[in-house]
């Protein structure tokens, strides 16, 4: 899989969660902030990143930097995805279904952020299993990265799209 250069894209970022995490030491607890950010250009490119620091803005900056390193390309057919797929990561499963134009993004929380920043305008999604934000995002991105257009599958099989679709 080739790496996507973030400097050539106009990326928009969206903060999904900020968590206060603690490290318990002899003298008490040491608090830090963990941020989860999704970035995308609303045109088929999306990624997520995590960052941890003692201050919230610094954690967010680190998360954005990380997200730009983890961009994936999302194949689209018009305003939706080419086919139904279940993205799996850990205990989090996300069902992604293509929808007709005008349906909108039917998704909850973190999944909505990923799909909107990827540029998918019409889609149905359902969270199955764990709904921990990071697992939902990872499952969604795993599902989106496995999508294939009919043209790509036809090319791999050495057939025309008409032959493939019957």
Swiss-Prot record:
InterPro entries: Ribosomal_Su5_D2-typ_SF, Ribosomal_uS5, Ribosomal_uS5_bac-type, Ribosomal_uS5_C, Ribosomal_uS5_N, Ribosomal_uS5_N_CS, Ribsml_uS5_D2-typ_fold_subgr. Residues 11-74 form the S5 DRBM domain. Changing residue 112 to H: In rpsE7; suppresses S12 mutant K55D. A ram mutation. GO terms for cellular component: cytosolic small ribosomal subunit. Changing residue 26 to I: In BSPC 111; spectinomycin resistant. SUPFAM superfamilies: dsRNA-binding domain-like (SSF54768), Ribosomal protein S5 domain 2-like (SSF54211). Pfam families: Ribosomal_S5 (PF00333), Ribosomal_S5_C (PF03719). One of its GO terms (biological process) is response to antibiotic. The keyword DNA repair does not apply. GO terms for molecular function: rRNA binding; structural constituent of ribosome. Keywords: Antibiotic resistance, Ribonucleoprotein, Ribosomal protein, RNA-binding, rRNA-binding. The N-terminal domain interacts with the head of the 30S subunit; the C-terminal domain interacts with the body and contacts protein S4. The interaction surface between S4 and S5 is involved in control of translational fidelity. PANTHER family: MITOCHONDRIAL RIBOSOMAL PROTEIN S5. Belongs to the universal ribosomal protein uS5 family. Part of the 30S ribosomal subunit. Contacts proteins S4 and S8. With S4 and S12 plays an important role in translational accuracy; many suppressors of streptomycin-dependent mutants of protein S12 are found in this protein, some but not all of which decrease translational accuracy (ram, ribosomal ambiguity mutations). Altered S5 proteins have been identified in a number of mutants. Some mutations in S5 have been shown to increase translational error frequencies. This is Small ribosomal subunit protein uS5. It comes from Bacillus subtilis (strain 168). The lineage of its organism: Bacteria, Bacillati, Bacillota, Bacilli, Bacillales. The gene is rpsE.
